[in-house]
């Protein structure tokens, strides 16, 4: 699999210029580039999407890609899977106004975000979280929001979302989150960085090496 590019959405406190970030980026890019099919060939070959008799398209699944990324990131790079940094509800509960009284009100928080897909802590103490996209575009938005909130509260200092390129998206399970559909919202997440003391939010874009019929 190819790593195409990493988009720095915001960088507060110079994290992107640190040796820690350089090592973290190299680590997960190695795991991206370890994903191949057929296994052992050193490149990722996928079947082109094909139209079925019912008019729907047959596409490649996404579970294999995440599993291969997980295997390398955990076993070779020594990250942790399904890890979290605790965010207290009191840290994110905000005061709003009720209409028409305009009284101050705190809406109860009845659910939390769950664990990140992958986490690690650098020798200097930077907490890092990665989300690997396997869901639809709504899932991508939730992942970005979760990373942004964790950065704002200081629970993590680096947050990364890994998503398919538009070309890869065409040949994967229908409606998976991808960079093209996220691109119009980057300005919103960028502005959230103004509230972060120290933190780096990144989207990394990945793609297949080859297509076959």
Task: Give the positions of each predicted feature.
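Nuclease-adjacent, charged terminal/linker segments that flank catalytic cores
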Residues: 1-86
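Structural motif
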Residues: 126-128, 158
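Short acidic, S/G/P-rich loop/turn micro-motifs used as interaction or catalytic elements
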Residues: 135-139, 166-169
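Arginine/glycine-rich "motif VI" loop of SF2 helicases in the C-terminal RecA-like domain
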Residues: 150-156, 191-195
């Amino acid at each position: 699999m190819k790593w195409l590019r990493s988009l720095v959405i915001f960088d507060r406190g110079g994290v992107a210029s640190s040796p820690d970030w350089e090592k973290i980026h190299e680590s997960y890019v190695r795991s991206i580039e370890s994903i191949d099919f057929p296994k052992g060939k050193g490149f990722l070959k996928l079947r082109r999407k094909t139209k079925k008799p019912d008019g729907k398209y047959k596409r490649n699944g996404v579970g294999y890609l995440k599993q291969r990324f997980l295997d390398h990131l955990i076993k070779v790079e020594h990250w942790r899977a399904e890890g979290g940094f605790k965010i207290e509800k009191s840290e994110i509960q905000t005061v709003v106004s009720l209409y028409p009284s305009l009284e101050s009100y705190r809406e109860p928080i009845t659910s939390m975000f769950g664990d990140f897909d992958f986490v690690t802590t650098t020798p200097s103490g930077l907490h890092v979280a990665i989300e690997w996209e396997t869901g639809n575009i709504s899932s991508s938005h939730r992942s970005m929001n979760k990373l942004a909130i964790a950065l704002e509260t200081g629970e993590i200092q680096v947050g990364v979302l890994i998503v398919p390129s538009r070309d890869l998206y065409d040949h994967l399970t229908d409606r998976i989150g991808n960079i093209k559909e996220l691109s119009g919202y980057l300005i919103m997440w960028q502005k959230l960085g103004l509230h972060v003391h120290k933190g780096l939010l990144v989207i990394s874009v990945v793609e297949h090496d080859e297509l076959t019929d």
